[in-house]
Amino acid sequence: MTNADPHELQKFSDLAHRWWDPNAEFKPLHELNPVRLKWIDSHAHLTGKRVLDIGCGGGILSESMATLGADVKGIDLSNEALGVADLHSLESGVTVNYEEIAAETLAAREPASFDVATCMEMLEHVPDPSKVVEACKTLVKPGGWVFFSTLNRNVKSYLFAVIGAEYVARMLPKGTHDYARFIRPSELAGFARAAGLLTADIKGITYNPLTRDFGLSSDTDVNYMLACRREA
């Protein structure tokens, strides 16, 4: 299997049936989604664009981008998650084309086919994130947008994203994240640059546990998002 960790895949496959429950394990994704969607749309203007959502899981971001008028394809390597995504798409009436395929495989099959690629909360779960970044560049057209989100690697992110979120607040199941796979912004920007992507914007994500609100910030110490463009 290309650039995939079977343990990571199984972890999310086991939770697939809970993906669209806004009060279950994926509650943080439901709460975060409006913030990341607005930020992506502010750069890429999604209406009418062909969009690829890499590591789409149950389709939370995929469906919301389609609702804005994008032609969305979602890919993942968890058959269980894709089954949930397909079923929810039928129930909601929001059209998304889902496929079980690796980004690298799709890049070889359909290079320069998308206006936008999103790869959110996924890079920290694969053995070689640089290969996914390279595939993202190949998949978008010249001038196309690529969006990433992941977790910084430092003491603060370990305390907040692992100890705080998984063990204290129990926002996430224990073992959701492997700290060793967290990626510093400089490392991700380096992967992007090596692939031929130009960094256009970086934003940190903040969380208020009292209001349960996510927001954008210049603080990239924990969660952050990176917007890139393929050179025209």
UniProtKB/Swiss-Prot annotation:
> Which BP terms in the Gene Ontology apply to this protein?
methylation
Q: Give EC number(s), comma-separated.
A: 2.1.1.222, 2.1.1.64
- Alphabetized UniProt keyword annotations: Methyltransferase, S-adenosyl-L-methionine, Transferase, Ubiquinone biosynthesis
> Which Gene Ontology molecular function entries are recorded, alphabetically?
2-polyprenyl-6-hydroxyphenol methylase activity; 3-demethylubiquinol 3-O-methyltransferase activity; polyprenyldihydroxybenzoate methyltransferase activity
EC main class here is transferase
- The domain of life is Bacteria
Record's catalysed reaction(s): a 3-demethylubiquinol + S-adenosyl-L-methionine = a ubiquinol + S-adenosyl-L-homocysteine + H(+); a 3-(all-trans-polyprenyl)benzene-1,2-diol + S-adenosyl-L-methionine = a 2-methoxy-6-(all-trans-polyprenyl)phenol + S-adenosyl-L-homocysteine + H(+)
Associated pathway: Cofactor biosynthesis; ubiquinone biosynthesis
Positions binding S-adenosyl-L-methionine in this chain are: 36, 55, 76, 120
Q: Which family does it belong to?
A: Belongs to the methyltransferase superfamily. UbiG/COQ3 family.
Quote the function comment for this protein: O-methyltransferase that catalyzes the 2 O-methylation steps in the ubiquinone biosynthetic pathway.
Annotated protein name in UniProt: Ubiquinone biosynthesis O-methyltransferase
